[in-house]
């Protein structure tokens, strides 16, 4: 099959990867928006988990990763629920890892093990431990394919960087001992600035935070009134929305009708309607300098200051005042 990606271009995919892409769990991700509630308050915020999963697979391929690691990259988000990380707010999961906690359960009860076995791969061996896949995932604050793709993809799609900038950065990535690094402090500084546009300016955008808060309230009410079950959250965003809208539950419907692109909110630390904090997301990639690996912030005052500002903002959270619902 031929696939076309806005960042990585045209690629021919066959064999096990083609079958996995066509499988129901991966196809479902076309109906899961990356930004959770974001698309309900801004129709342009519509990157899907499917686009990101394909992107992670292609980035691992570009960096010379094995087919096995490409498989892990393609499948790493299949257990994301409807509305992505909104569900972490619903279940008050501060680590924002609900989807990781149910990953094995979702995989086992799908056709994925049969597809892998058909092509000579063992599900347990491939998918039981992400730490094996050092291009795919690294603990923060290092770079990895997952973190890199969602940052470049969102920021390109939402107009904060251009395609040339994204592709230039990708050309400045090097791989050492199975891990990815920027090849210069300039490349590191550029990515750090873009990453904080993503996790501070976008994730903590007052409109975005409002959408998360009110959709989480709607889902909590729906679960409390047995309008939906936790299992329903493994449907697509639209399927769950359809259930909520058809419920005739006044509390759920009232909350849903308050989530739309016309809402007006501001940050106000004094007269606020609600406060929300998200998972601390910091980036400080290592670079190779003077024959040793060193954190970018140890070389660049710019990276250090950006990291400190992001830390303080994330620690404080966002205080939202509603002007118009």
From Swiss-Prot:
It comes from the Bacteria. One of its GO terms (molecular function) is dGTPase activity. Residues 49-151 form the HD domain. GO terms for biological process: dGTP catabolic process. This is Uncharacterized protein YdhJ.
């Amino acid at each position: 099959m031929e696939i076309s990606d806005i960042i990585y271009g045209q690629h021919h995919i066959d064999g096990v990867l083609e079958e996995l892409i066509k499988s129901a769990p991966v196809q479902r991700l076309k109906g899961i928006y990356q930004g959770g509630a974001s698309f309900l308050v801004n129709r342009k915020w519509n990157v899907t988990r499917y686009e990101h999963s394909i992107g992670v697979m292609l980035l691992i391929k570009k960096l010379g990763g094995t087919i096995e690691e490409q498989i892990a990259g393609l499948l790493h988000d299949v257990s994301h629920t409807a509305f992505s990380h909104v569900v972490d707010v619903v279940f008050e999961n501060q680590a924002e890892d609900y989807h990781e906690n149910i990953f094995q359960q979702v995989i086992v009860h799908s056709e994925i093990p049969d597809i892998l076995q058909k092509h000579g791969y063992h599900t347990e061996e491939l998918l039981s431990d992400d730490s094996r896949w050092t291009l795919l995932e690294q603990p923060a604050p290092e770079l990895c394919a997952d973190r890199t793709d969602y940052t470049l993809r969102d920021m390109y799609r939402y107009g904060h960087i251009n395609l040339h900038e994204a592709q230039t950065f990708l050309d400045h990535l090097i791989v050492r001992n199975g891990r990815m690094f920027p090849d210069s402090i300039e490349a590191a500084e550029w990515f750090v600035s873009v990453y904080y546009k993503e996790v501070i300016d976008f994730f903590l955008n007052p409109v975005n935070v409002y959408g998360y808060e009110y959709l989480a309230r709607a889902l909590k009410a729906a679960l409390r009134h047995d309008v939906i079950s936790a299992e329903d959250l493994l449907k697509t965003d639209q399927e769950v929305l359809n259930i909520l809208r058809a419920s005739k539950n006044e509390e759920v419907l009232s909350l849903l009708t308050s989530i739309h692109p016309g809402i007006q909110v501001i940050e106000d630390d004094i007269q606020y309607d609600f406060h929300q904090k998200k998972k601390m997301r910091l980036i400080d990639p290592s670079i190779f300098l003077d024959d040793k690996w060193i954190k970018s912030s140890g070389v660049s005052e710019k990276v250090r200051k950006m990291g400190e500002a992001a830390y303080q903002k994330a620690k404080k959270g966002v205080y939202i005042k509603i002007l118009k619902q």
